[in-house]
Amino acid sequence: MRQNYDDRKIVKQYREIARQIVKKEGLYKNMDQAELCEQTNFWREKFKTKPMTDRDKINIFALAREAASRIIGLDAVVVQLIGALVLGDGKVAEMKTGEGKTLMSLFVMFIEVMRGNRVHLVTANEYLARRDREEIGQVLEYLGVSVALNESGLDIAQKKAIYTADVIYGTASEFGFDYLRDNMVRQKEDKVQSGLDFVLIDEADSILIDEARTPLLISDRKEEDLSLYHTANKLVKKMMKDDYEMEEHKRFVWLNDAGIEKAQKFWGVESLYSAEAQSELRITMLLMRAHFLMHKDKDYVVLDDEVLIIDPHTGRALPGRRFNDGLHQAIEAKEGVEVKEESRTLATITIQNYFRMYKKISGMTGTAKTEEEEFRQIYNMDVVVIPTNLRVNREDMQDDIFYTKKEKGRAIVYEVSWRYEKGQPTLIGTSSIKSNEWISGLLDAAGIPHQVLNAKNHAQEAEIIAKAGKRGMVTLATNMAGRGTDIKLDPDVHKLGGLAVIGTERHESRRIDLQLMGRSGRRGDPGFSKFMISLEDDLLEQFESKSWEKLSTKLKRKAPRDGKPVNSRKIHAVVVDAQKRLEGANYDIRKDLLSYDEVIDLQRKMVYKERDLLLERNKLGVSSEKILREVAEYSFIHPSDIPEEELEIYYSRQKELLGGTKFPISFDQVTLMDPREVVEEIVSWHKKERNKFPAETIAAIEREVYLNLMDQMWVMHLDAMVQLREGIHLRAYGQQDPLVMYQKEGAQLFEKFQADYHFYFAHALLELDPDGLIQG
């Protein structure tokens, strides 16, 4: 993207500082490593008591620049230093691919460590984390800064050691899972994360936007009748188009009146929306999503009788990841493979809410300006476009738009064939495995040798990408495979025009198109890019616009069938409009997810805060007597004029509180006593029993029981919130705002959760026996 006025203003301001940093290159030239480490210690100590000035920044950057020159032989150029200064302001730096973002990260991490902050560097995958830790980590270590790599599969002791480092490399999911696991421990000493000071996110658009739709989940197996999925599959397979309504771009499908009647008859229920039919309704809706919204070889792939999710932004399969809330099981039933047990959520957080907990956040990527509004609204981060060190030498052509996919396919083969014959390497980008395999078949038929990269063979990704810049190589890849790694050109390829990039479809986001184009023309290399699309592509087929429907029908009817592109201004404008609308719809989905998660987020923070206090104090924050009194009063004291059916609820609660406990008065006697007298008897008896225990022992027992019950009830509450979330959109058709209803009913469920674990804690207190154990 081009710089706007604000970007130019910021860059101009920082260019002068960057030039001063370069001028300081002689300052540390004659110092040995020990002296450079002394400088590091000097700056660390200084900023414990004093603020950092621009002059300090210049000297610190110059120190890091000297170390990088010595250790990895790279001298940071002015634009890299400008980018690092932008990152230091808590912004997103958009820097073209191949311009040296990895080296840029060194400076902002080093300066944040000097400020006394612990730094987390987040990358898209463990391979990149390991690679960058080795390259930049050695420079930081040379300067006396400790560096660690946060990997999955480590034990608590190893994790604790990692989190003592000044700079920690890792993936978003691993840092997020560590946070969730920390809030499931039973002892304070088992927590590993030590403060969320500063996070620098590489490929920020991918992590903060693309991955934001998928929450992080820790789960275990959930008991469920899996045969219902196969049964519901039979129903959905028989459904006709007039049984349901669908908004595919919003990923939403629902039964209309005809469909409801058919489903009720199939399940043998009077009402599909009755409490008794909740499981049948839920699983029917899941199977409808699986059949009508989830597409094989686009959203998922079936390999070795297993359903694997396809990352929509990279085209990679994600082994070990499953769609949550029963959708994965529904797809398994649809595809006729083994339906595996659904997981039950133990802890969850969205990427957005995890990273918003850091005191300071910065990001770097090759493409972010198109999503600046989202970065601002959700993360409070501006995006600044950093100029390139060398002029971009890539030729970006206008799209060729064809009437049909068949015509498009022929044109792509022709375009690739003449480039192949002259030896120019070509990268062909597709948006799905299906499209990838279709183009591959056309190339095979034309006798053009090529290598294929998609979710089915992504294990060979590094090897395939390494060959993509070789003379005469044709590479066919889904989306952004190989992102984060360079396609290096053979020396003789430059005179042939560099790497040619052919896009076969416009993606859901202009940003992903720009990423594909950005594979070519790196660091001043020559290059070429062009999109070859058709009126039958998903983007235009699903575009809902009356004027476009009329124009599309007219164009297809009058198509000359000569295989030439349409290429009218009007159609190019439609493509841009369709893409912008889809971007807006996807942004709304992410905002929607965040709005719903903010309800859980507030509840989660309250629960985790109480947990932390329990672990810190090693005893309850309030007296057990106070909790018992409140529960007893809630159970026994009620208005004298309450209806008979509500009175039954009170009796039931009283029986549950006292049933199976050591309380010496029988329930028959209790019913004859004054309710306030019962409360006092319960409290005084518990007090007497409690005093039989040593103070430390009883405090430890109460804390353990309270913590255990809170954790158990929290898991049940999360499950209830999932069920509420799944059904809440049905309210939209009852003239009620589903989000408002979710907030209201979610708050009621949270109050119930708190009341429940207090109730069962009170019950447990009455089960204390003289040996100091909790029975039952």
Curated annotation (Swiss-Prot):
GO MF entries: ATP binding; protein-exporting ATPase activity
Catalytic activity, as annotated: ATP + H2O + cellular proteinSide 1 = ADP + phosphate + cellular proteinSide 2
CC annotations in GO: cell envelope Sec protein transport complex; cytosol; plasma membrane
The entry's keywords: ATP-binding, Cell membrane, Cytoplasm, Membrane, Nucleotide-binding, Protein transport, Translocase, Translocation, Transport
Classification via InterPro entries: Helicase_ATP-bd, Helicase_C-like, P-loop_NTPase, SecA, SecA_DEAD, SecA_motor_DEAD, SecA_preprotein_X-link_dom, SecA_SF2_C
Enzyme class of the recorded protein, top EC level: translocase
Topological relation to the membrane, as annotated: Peripheral membrane protein
Annotated SUPFAM superfamilies: Helical scaffold and wing domains of SecA, P-loop containing nucleoside triphosphate hydrolases, Pre-protein crosslinking domain of SecA
Annotated positions binding ATP: 80, 98-102, 486
Domain of life: Bacteria
Subcellular location, record wording: Cell membrane; Cytoplasm
One GO biological process term: protein transport by the Sec complex
EC number: 7.4.2.8
Subunit structure: Monomer and homodimer. Part of the essential Sec protein translocation apparatus which comprises SecA, SecYEG and auxiliary proteins SecDF. Other proteins may also be involved.
Function field: Part of the Sec protein translocase complex. Interacts with the SecYEG preprotein conducting channel. Has a central role in coupling the hydrolysis of ATP to the transfer of proteins into and across the cell membrane, serving as an ATP-driven molecular motor driving the stepwise translocation of polypeptide chains across the membrane.
Family annotation (PANTHER family): CHLOROPLAST PROTEIN-TRANSPORTING ATPASE, SECA INNER MEMBRANE COMPONENT OF SEC PROTEIN SECRETION SYSTEM
Similarity comment text for this entry: Belongs to the SecA family.
Protein name: Protein translocase subunit SecA 2
Gene: secA2
